[in-house]
Amino acid sequence: MNNLDFDIVIVGLGPTGGTLANLLAMNNVSVLILEKEANIYNLPRAVHFDDEIMRVFQTIGITKSLSKKLIINKGTKFIDDNGELLLDWPRPKKITENGWYPSYRFHQPDL
């Protein structure tokens, strides 16, 4: 059996694991990613991120290709199973001091 030597092992290649792997590799850290699924899970489990996360994506160089798959989020309403409004969370549609919109929606398998 071959001995493999990595600085970091990441378990799971979702958006967080993939982003972390890219950031570490950019800093010359050797990374092994372990993912139990052979294919991308086709249903979203995460659907939102903000301008600070977009800055992280900018750092790893994926904002141009990613922007084509994003929706600028004008807000979110949380409604219970009786149709009652629990929370109305409007988001401004203007660029923040981070250089990006404050709220984005996405389809996780696309990321």
Where is each model-derived feature located?
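A structure-centric signal for secondary-structure junctions around beta-strands
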Residues: 5, 28, 72-75
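Glycine-rich FAD pyrophosphate-binding loop
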Residues: 9, 23-45
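Conserved structural-core and active-site-/substrate-pathway-adjacent residues in large, well-folded domains
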Residues: 10-12, 21, 57, 111
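Conserved functional loop/turn residues at catalytic and ligand-binding sites
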Residues: 12, 28, 61
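Active-site-adjacent segment of FAD-dependent monooxygenases/related oxidoreductases
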Residues: 45, 50-111
